[in-house]
Amino acid sequence: MIRSNGGPSRGRLVWCGLVATAALASEAALAEDHALAARAGLLGLGVEYAHSLGDRWAVRVGWNGSELGFEAEESGIDYDLDLVWDSLAVGVDFHPTGGALRLSAGLLRNDNRVEARGELNDTVTIGGTTYDSDAVGSLFGRVTFDNSAVFAGIGWDWSRRRTRGVGVSLDIGVLSQGSPRVSLRASGPIADVPEFEDDLAAEEAEFEDEIKDLDLLPFATIGVVFRF
């Protein structure tokens, strides 16, 4: 019988080779598992973390937040408006070809809103009734939506085939956020008069009807992705 007097057996060498190969493959896979992105679009500015679940699936968590001021006129009243983006999103991506193309859906914790302040001159008509501006004072308004919203869309993440480095992403879709709700209040001495409160409620209802189409909000975002 011939015995080996030292050195590893062929089986042990093969096993060690397989373990080393698996370790290298695992390390390469982990390098593709994580990504951070900075995004900008119709939902504001945001940051996002993504984690791949194989070749075709990924999950993403992101936050959008920013503010934009502008002016607008409604029912003869000039308003200073602040459009506030504040949302936290959790979504799932499906890559049907395993490449850049992705189909996305998810949930949004939605605190997007519009805040308004209206300064009145002379007289103003509210709910069909004309009031003196000194009696009404300033008008303050807010437009809000459901706290929970859902979204769906299509996009492309051209960084997906990189092991690490920087790429670009693009997403378009629609956000279902429920019917907009309008609240108005006045700072003047008639603010608590029942008849004025009724007219203010009528003004709120009219404004809600004018912006009812905002329950479905199209969006588009572009991002710079760092994959590691």
Where are these regions (language model features)?
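N-terminal secretory signal peptides that target proteins for export/translocation
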Residues: M1-G11
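N-terminal signal peptide c-region/cleavage motif recognized by signal peptidases
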Residues: S26-E27
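A membrane-pore/channel beta-structure motif
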Residues: A31-D33, A40-L42, S52, S66-E67, ...
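Transmembrane beta-strands of outer-membrane beta-barrel proteins
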Residues: H34-A38, V47, D55, V59-V61, ...
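Outer-membrane beta-barrel strand-turn architecture
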Residues: H51-D55, P96-G98, W158-R162, F228
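Extracellular/periplasm-exposed beta-strand and loop segments of Gram-negative cell-envelope proteins
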Residues: W63-L88, N112-A149, G178-L217
